[in-house]
Amino acid sequence: MNTKEIVNKYEFKFNKNLGQNFLIDESVLEDIIEGAEISKEDTVIEIGPGVGTLTKELLERAKEVYSIELDGDLIPILQEELKEYNNFTLIHKDALKIDFNELMENKESIKLVANLPYYVTTPIISRLLTEKCDFKSLTIMIQKEVAERINAEPNCKEYGSLTVLVQYYCNTKIIRKVSPNSFIPRPKVDSIVIKLDRLSEPRVRVKSQKLFFNVVRSSFNMRRKTLWNSLKSLNIDKESMENAFERAGIDPKRRGETLSIEEFGKLSDCIYDIL
């Protein structure tokens, strides 16, 4: 059965508070599966399985699938629809409260697949990356604007701290755009399927990741301000900051959105050296 048929079969009522939008376009489903590159060696962690349409395809291809679902009304539906699969584990919990490192412990070749409610997109991605969860890739359907921020390059309005965070840890690839007509109920925004491939090492080697991300966040907190003004929040004396900018070879009159990840790394290391 397809998604609409399962929804009708169980007379499922969508929960607006959970931002539920179920995928009904099979071509998108196929592109997610193909983009995620799932094999029998892979353990898949799925966030937001809905009624299990994508989950079935994952179960057919993966070694095992762990699906995390918050909505208690979906649990019996998923249990019934997927009862024939012995490589399926259903976790009734809020993904924001999951200990992903514990879940991934002693598992190899972990890939994440998710149709994330828009309100949890950034917190989930940030946790998976900053907590150093051991996954190979993350294939997600997210709001178009967020995907464009993740995939952005310097000198454009989409480029920001989320861009730097994700691209510090991952290569990014947009798989396809998805229209609101591909869901029930129909969302008010366009979506994008994007894949994040985890790098074996961060994109730049820095002396302090904590300082690096502090510099990045401060640089984007007030986008229209120069780096010199934005980084005053670090509470470093004027002479030391002048020295750091000079050693990094970066003009303090530039704005954060003009710096590459490599330049942020160079600047944060020069600040680290003078602290």
From Swiss-Prot:
Subcellular location, principal: cytoplasm
Name of the protein: Ribosomal RNA small subunit methyltransferase A
Keywords: Cytoplasm, Methyltransferase, RNA-binding, rRNA processing, S-adenosyl-L-methionine, Transferase
GO MF terms, alphabetically ordered: 16S rRNA (adenine(1518)-N(6)/adenine(1519)-N(6))-dimethyltransferase activity; RNA binding
UniProt record similarity statement: Belongs to the class I-like SAM-binding methyltransferase superfamily. rRNA adenine N(6)-methyltransferase family. RsmA subfamily.
Statement: the UniProt record of this protein carries the keyword Transferase: yes
EC category name: transferase
